[in-house]
UniProtKB/Swiss-Prot annotation:
Organism of origin: Clostridium botulinum (strain Langeland / NCTC 10281 / Type F)
InterPro entries xref list: Asp/Glu-ADT_sf_sub_c, GatC
Family membership: Belongs to the GatC family.
Keyword terms, alphabetized: ATP-binding, Ligase, Nucleotide-binding, Protein biosynthesis
Domain of life according to the entry: Bacteria
Primary role: Allows the formation of correctly charged Asn-tRNA(Asn) or Gln-tRNA(Gln) through the transamidation of misacylated Asp-tRNA(Asn) or Glu-tRNA(Gln) in organisms which lack either or both of asparaginyl-tRNA or glutaminyl-tRNA synthetases. The reaction takes place in the presence of glutamine and ATP through an activated phospho-Asp-tRNA(Asn) or phospho-Glu-tRNA(Gln).
Protein name (Swiss-Prot/TrEMBL): Aspartyl/glutamyl-tRNA(Asn/Gln) amidotransferase subunit C
Its EC number(s): 6.3.5.-
GO biological process: one example: translation
Quaternary organization: Heterotrimer of A, B and C subunits.
Entry's Gene Ontology molecular function annotations: asparaginyl-tRNA synthase (glutamine-hydrolyzing) activity; ATP binding; glutaminyl-tRNA synthase (glutamine-hydrolyzing) activity
Length: 95
């Protein structure tokens, strides 16, 4: 399998990208090098290799949820630069 200049132009058109002729030639060359390298994997003998879905056998380490005392509302409001009744006033970030 190889990549042609026509393939590069087609993908560029789909992505709405424009390239110079030299860049297209470079893409063709680079992509063909990558594909040739990947074809070397076909030469590997994998008969004795077990199928592995995930090479990392990591288990989640869960911890117990510990309820801790949080700040009282009055303390939060007292520490806020601006507040209105029970609400902290913050600068507008979305129009």
């Amino acid at each position: 399998m190889s990549v042609s200049k026509k393939d590069v132009e087609y993908v560029a058109e789909l992505a709405r990208l424009e390239f110079k002729e030299e860049e297209k030639d470079n893409f063709v060359n680079d992509l063909n090098k990558i594909l040739n390298y990947m074809e070397k994997l076909d030469e590997l003998n994998t008969d004795d290799v077990d199928i592995v879905v995930n090479p990392y056998y990591i288990e989640n380490k869960y911890r117990e949820d510990n309820v801790e005392k949080s700040m009282e509302l009055k303390e939060v409001i007292d520490n806020a630069p601006e507040s209105l009744e029970e609400y902290v006033i913050v600068p507008k970030v979305i129009d």
